[in-house]
Amino acid sequence: MKLFLLVLLSFSLLVSCKKESTSSEKNTQEKKFDMYEMSEMAALMEQMYVDNQRLKERITKGDTIGKFPNHFIKIHNAVMTDESENDVFFKQQAAKFIKAQELIYQDPKNAKEHFNTGVDACIQCHQQKCSGPIPRIKKLYID
């Protein structure tokens, strides 16, 4: 009787172990890795961030400002991750941002003030729409 129980217990352990490995193999095969694709707006905002880092450095050093980056205008019609976010509020904040950016190049004597106004517009919009990048955006401020 003891031998029978020992054989039965051993058999159950082997069967249960085998089932687990089979199910983990299925899970590995079923998992699909989906690559995140940035929306046109997300990519534009990443580019604007980099451009503004460089601009901040030029303003801080007192270098020449250069020309307004015309690709910033795409903010008005770039495809967003969630199209419902492209509402009146977003359009107003985008206009404030563009106006501040244009003023940097039109009035370089007050570039720091105009630059920080542009950063303000970004933060105000992101407080309503997508708060994730706010800490990063705040690093753009010129003291």
Question: Model-found features: residue ranges?
Answer:
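The canonical Cys-X-X-Cys-His
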Residues: G118-C130
